[in-house]
């Protein structure tokens, strides 16, 4: 169990390190960890979120942080720097997660809400 927890932590750190890569995939992380893709998926299944959900959540958190810290940056630039391959996908995923468009989030953040 301790080894599983350590590997999951390593996997999460690798995800964080490679978030900006739109091709971040289980095979890449599994290879860096020295485990099979199946084993990697099993690590995440035992946790609360799947690999892909973890990647998406981390990308969204990073994009929100960047919108707060760099309000002058274009949303398209932020989305790309967080690893979203298309702006349409970013808007769809952001809206599904937070119930608002990224621009609305940015406006609220700048109003101090």
Regions found by a protein language model. Give the residues of each.
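Short glycine/serine/threonine/alanine-rich loop segments
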Residues: 35, 84, 100
């Amino acid at each position: 169990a301790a080894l599983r927890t350590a590997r999951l932590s390593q996997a999460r750190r690798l995800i964080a390190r490679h978030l900006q890569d739109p091709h971040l995939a289980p095979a890449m992380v599994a290879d860096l960890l020295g485990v099979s893709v199946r084993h990697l998926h099993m690590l995440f299944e035992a946790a609360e979120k799947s690999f892909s959900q973890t990647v998406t959540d981390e990308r969204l958190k990073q994009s929100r942080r960047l919108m707060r810290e760099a309000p002058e940056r274009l949303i398209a630039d932020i989305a790309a720097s967080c690893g979203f391959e298309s702006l349409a996908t970013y808007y769809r995923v952001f809206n599904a997660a937070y119930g608002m468009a990224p621009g609305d989030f940015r406006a609220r953040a700048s109003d101090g809400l």
